Regions:
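Terminal targeting signals and extreme-terminal segments of soluble enzymes
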Residues: 1-134
């Protein structure tokens, strides 16, 4: 999938509230995709930092996009597990969310996601298992 196909996937496959995050493709390899998450007031809680729920949604979305990219297009799939560690708060600047496929089995795909702030510092780390449904 090229950048325009990834943009189309983001625009047509996900729920409206995920589209409202404003994720855009930043880069990709055969087994990974990096999405840019623009920092916006609507993503921050009272403490002024981006909510952890936003990082988890962006991480899950990035992994689905990385899998679709590796498969050459979207297939029905579901997240089986997503374990996230929040390492530092992000108050300002865009965030880069990189999903990397670690192992692809017949039905299960294992991956990890890193969320970096604008300075490249690791803000969150997640591991995930996704099941292909078709």
């Amino acid at each position: 999938m090229d950048e325009s196909a990834i943009r189309a996937l983001l625009d047509t496959t996900f729920a409206p509230w995920i589209r409202d995050l404003g994720l855009t493709p930043a880069s990709s390899t055969d087994t990974s995709v990096t999405l840019r998450l623009p920092n916006a007031d609507k993503l921050r809680h009272v403490g002024g930092v981006i909510c952890g729920q936003v990082f988890m949604a962006a991480a899950d979305t990035a992994m689905i996009v990385a899998i679709a990219h590796a498969l050459g297009g979207f297939q029905p799939m579901t997240t089986v597990s997503l374990t996230t560690s929040f390492l530092r708060p992000v108050k300002a600047g865009d965030v880069l969310v990189t999903a990397n496929i670690l192992r692809r089995g017949r039905n299960l795909i294992f991956g990890e996601i890193e969320v970096h702030d604008e300075n490249g510092a690791l803000a969150a780390h997640a591991t995930t298992t996704v099941m292909l449904l078709a």
